[in-house]
Design a protein with these regions (language model features):
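Export/targeting segments at the very N-terminus of extracytoplasmic proteins
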Residues: 2-37, 85, 89-108
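Long, amphipathic alpha-helical surface segments
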Residues: 3-17, 30, 41, 68, ...
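Second-shell loop/turn segments in exported
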Residues: 16-22, 72-86, 102-107, 135-140, ...
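Short, functionally critical alpha-helical segments immediately adjacent to catalytic or ligand/cofactor-binding
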Residues: 29-41, 114-122
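Residue-level detector of buried hydrophobic side-chain packing
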Residues: 35, 61, 117-118, 149, ...
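Surface-exposed patches in mature extracellular/periplasmic domains of secreted proteins
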Residues: 43-48, 100-114, 152, 186-191
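Substrate-binding/active-site groove segments that recognize
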Residues: 49-76, 92-96
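Alpha-helical segment that forms one wall of the substrate-binding/catalytic cleft
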Residues: 73-105, 110-131, 146
């Protein structure tokens, strides 16, 4: 799931997400809309994401799902928008519960901050945070420092081992939501591996 160029439609402009402020709306509905837009909206038919290097990613459907009911999406997979929205809500709830259970500080974050972290985990998987090798991100979230969290999230912009502009754009948009600012002009600060997180 990336925000790189979708083969079947044009790429979204990052400033389109400026209007989202999860504090002003119901958390679940706004988080669903935020993620849906980052994923290119609802897609009834399976599609493949075109990576920056021209290769095609996995088959995807709905709101950026590569798996439905534990099975990989194929060109024959079907889904309704109602089904897709329910899967998206279930996934958001699962991610939210995971962070509440494993990172107590998460419960003290603002709705915008939670929405940004959920979007990140929806895109990368919660395992990116949990594996021991990713100590910078894990410690940043466990510590609750906003700058360390967004900088650590910003390290995850590769697809297939190569930098992906769509993922860089997505991390930028998530960072701006986390900081409750617009999506323009934010640049990640690189974190050295030996930084004491």
């Amino acid at each position: 799931m990336t925000t790189s160029q979708i083969v079947t439609s044009s790429e979204k402009n990052p400033t389109e997400y400026d209007r989202y402020n999860i504090d002003d709306y119901g958390w679940m509905d706004t988080t669903k809309q935020f993620i849906s837009n980052l994923e290119g909206g609802f897609r009834e038919k399976p599609y493949r994401v075109k990576n920056d290097d021209g290769t095609l990613g996995n088959w995807t459907i709905g709101h950026g799902f590569e798996y439905i009911n534990g099975q990989p999406v194929t060109p024959q997979t079907t889904i309704t928008e109602e089904q897709s929205l329910q899967i998206l809500e279930d996934k958001i709830t699962e991610i939210d519960s995971h962070f509440l259970e494993n990172y107590p500080i998460y419960g003290d974050l603002s709705p915008n901050q939670k929405g940004a972290i959920v979007s990140f985990a929806f895109n990368t998987g919660t395992n990116v945070v949990d594996v021991p090798e990713n100590r910078i991100l894990r410690k940043a979230i466990a510590g609750g420092d906003p700058n360390k969290i967004i900088n650590a999230m910003g390290l995850y912009f590769n697809s297939g081992g190569k930098p992906n502009q769509g993922l860089k754009n997505r991390r930028n948009i998530e960072a701006q939501l986390f900081l409750n600012n617009n999506a323009n002009g934010f640049t990640y600060q690189q974190i050295p591996e030996d930084d004491n997180y």
